[in-house]
């Protein structure tokens, strides 16, 4: 298996969303899993369609199919269901790991005090 592609368990989760059968009007369809691997490659690399490796299929066919799936709402439906099923309990952003630029230390303070102007009225009342 290619490290850029879907794992077997990932493919099984999204297999039901993939339209089409095994044979199209003009012959055998392109492998759906290979097509999704091509989309993942595009998302990860940020490359152009023409840069798609040949092992993932003809870039013109992948591009056409991508726009067909967008029009049919296949990818929207797939992402909506996967987002609902996502286990985000483990997800946490820890600011001790994230480094900020030295000039990103904070906003400038207003003259005459440490509190933002919008909070001054709240403290007085």
From Swiss-Prot:
Keywords linked to the UniProt accession: Plasmid, Transposable element, Transposition
InterPro entries: IS402-like_dom, Transposase_6_like
Pfam families assigned: DUF4096 (PF13340)
Source domain of life: Bacteria
Hydrolase recorded as keyword: no
Cystines in this chain: none
The keyword NAD appears for this protein: no
Biological process according to GO: transposition
Assigned protein family: To transposase of insertion sequence IS6501.
Protein name: Uncharacterized protein y4sN
Species, as recorded: Sinorhizobium fredii (strain NBRC 101917 / NGR234)
């Amino acid at each position: 298996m290619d490290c850029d592609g879907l794992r077997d368990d990932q493919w099984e989760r999204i297999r039901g969303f993939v339209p089409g059968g095994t044979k199209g009007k003009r012959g055998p369809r392109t492998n759906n899993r290979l097509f999704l691997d091509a989309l993942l490659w595009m998302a990860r690399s940020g490359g152009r369609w023409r840069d798609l490796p040949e092992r993932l299929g003809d870039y013109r066919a992948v591009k056409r199919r991508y726009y067909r799936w967008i029009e049919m709402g296949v990818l929207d439906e797939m992402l909506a269901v996967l987002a609902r099923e996502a286990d985000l309990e483990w997800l946490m952003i820890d600011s001790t790991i994230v480094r900020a630029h030295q000039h990103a230390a904070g906003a400038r303070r207003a003259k005459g005090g440490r509190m933002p102007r919008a909070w001054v009225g709240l403290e007085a009342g």
